[in-house]
């Protein structure tokens, strides 16, 4: 994809979130089942995925017993083909691996970087999943309204950075642009599908790995909506309309413009990932991180998102 088309798609998506922040946020309150599995794979706590699946988490609320780490200042692997089928954990550690993170209540605050944080619901999930944990949360998003509305009650332990992530990837500045100290965990959920181009998606994953300390973890989700016949059919229909409206050329394979609640002129760019693309993305950080797990979760089928969990090498 040429840079001009990529920028136009990013601008369409940014406009969508600015104009639909409230309605979008109202549909993004619950935790995803895959998040609990990610914590299990990081060995942060046992049985989280089962708790999420059973609905025992508190949707959209924060835990009253969460300790506060104090106000934060803003300026402050294994090859995927060796991992077996989705849902299997790869074998033992490779040379250069370090001990995995195991959270303990006596530790310093658990430092978490959430890139494309949206309304901050992953923080609320962590507060429920790790009761009593002090969490230092570094939130990055281009839609300030969406983030600030969701994180308003957590000002003491949240540092928010407004950043146009997609365009930072296009101009090659993403690693310099993210403002956060080395963290224990970096996540990016529900956003990789908004990034045009495989090279830019790989660049974001490398930036996430670079942001964590040795032994820290990275977890990302990759939307595979083409696996749903209903979603795939809608994507084809809305993309055809949007291309005419915006005068766009033919898009790359797997690229679509999705509508929103039957609203006029409300589109966002989305890429649906093939299994091969998931494997290719994992390979992009082979030298920097080991693949801890690859699995599928979420949606009506329990398989609309593909997750990758990594541990940074020493």
Where are the model-predicted features located?
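A short, conserved alpha-helix within the catalytic core of class I
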Residues: 195-207
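Short catalytic micro-motifs in class I SAM-dependent methyltransferases
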Residues: 190-194
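Local beta-strand N-terminus motif with an aromatic residue
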Residues: 109, 182-183
């Amino acid at each position: 994809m040429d840079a001009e088309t990529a920028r136009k798609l990013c601008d369409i998506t940014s406009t969508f979130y600015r104009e639909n922040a409230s309605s979008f946020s109202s549909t993004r309150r619950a935790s995803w089942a895959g998040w609990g599995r990610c914590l299990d794979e990081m060995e942060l706590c046992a049985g989280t995925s089962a708790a999420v699946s059973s609905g025992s988490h508190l949707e959209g609320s924060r835990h009253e017993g969460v300790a506060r780490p104090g106000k934060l200042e803003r300026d402050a692997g294994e090859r995927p083909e060796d991992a077996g089928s989705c849902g299997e954990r790869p074998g033992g550690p490779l040379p250069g691996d370090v001990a995995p993170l195991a959270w303990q209540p006596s530790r310093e605050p658990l430092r978490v970087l959430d890139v494309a944080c949206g309304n901050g619901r992953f923080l609320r999930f962590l507060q429920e999943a790790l009761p009593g944990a002090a969490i230092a949360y570094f939130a990055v998003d281009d839609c300030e309204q969406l983030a600030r509305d969701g994180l308003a009650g957590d000002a003491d332990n949240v540092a928010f950075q407004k950043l146009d992530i997609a365009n930072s990837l296009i101009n090659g500045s993403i690693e310099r642009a993210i403002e956060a100290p080395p963290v224990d965990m970096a996540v990016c959920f529900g956003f990789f599908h908004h990034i045009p181009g495989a090279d830019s998606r790989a660049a974001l994953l490398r930036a996430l790995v670079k942001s964590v300390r040795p032994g820290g973890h990275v977890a990302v989700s990759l939307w595979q909506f083409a696996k749903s016949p209903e979603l795939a059919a809608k994507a084809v229909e809305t993309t055809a309309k949007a291309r005419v409206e915006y005068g766009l050329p033919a898009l790359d394979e797997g690229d679509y413009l999705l509508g929103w609640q039957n609203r006029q002129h409300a589109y966002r760019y989305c890429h649906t990932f093939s299994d091969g693309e998931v494997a290719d993305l994992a390979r992009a950080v082979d030298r920097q991180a080991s693949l801890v797990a690859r699995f599928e979760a979420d949606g009506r089928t329990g398989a609309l998102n593909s997750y990758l969990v990594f541990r940074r090498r020493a």
